[in-house]
């Protein structure tokens, strides 16, 4: 059953790819522009930690970078090969891992930590964490020898 579900997911992604490519077929965003924009975006995320805002929209980020939402969407989907939310959530997961390594956060619940990292719900945090890391947040905390309140 699990294998069938996985195969359906793979087939679904294969069907989506041509749709995404068709959407950007007439794009005039250059590789050089993507490289530059990706660098600016990474610097912005590391310096300003925009990902901790759970309400951050792609339009907000595009305005900060002074590009269109189309260009930013192209950057994520074609150049970085991930969607906007996966990009943000990757930073949020790294933030979570950074926080749980600090003793001062050991009294926080997982939900509170997830919110500090920018996740808007416990469910989306748990789902994405397990998808990316392969274990639950609780299992991760135990694996690094820490404890928390949940």
Predicted segments — roles?
Residues 2-112, 116, 128-131, 138-150:
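Membrane-proximal linker segments that couple transmembrane helices to downstream signaling/catalytic modules
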């Amino acid at each position: 059953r699990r294998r069938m579900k996985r195969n359906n997911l793979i087939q679904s992604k294969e069907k989506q790819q041509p749709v995404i490519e068709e959407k950007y077929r007439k794009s005039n965003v250059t590789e050089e522009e993507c490289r530059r924009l990706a660098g600016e975006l990474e610097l912005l995320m590391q310096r300003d930690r925009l990902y901790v805002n759970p309400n951050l929209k792609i339009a907000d980020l595009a305005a900060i970078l002074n590009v269109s939402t189309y260009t930013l969407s192209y950057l994520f989907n074609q150049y970085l090969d991930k969607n906007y939310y996966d990009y943000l959530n990757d930073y949020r997961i790294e933030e979570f891992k950074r926080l749980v390594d600090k003793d001062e956060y050991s009294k926080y619940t997982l939900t509170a930590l997830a919110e500090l990292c920018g996740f808007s719900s416990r469910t989306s945090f748990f789902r994405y964490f397990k998808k990316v890391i392969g274990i639950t947040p609780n299992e991760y905390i135990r694996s690094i020898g820490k404890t928390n309140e949940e």
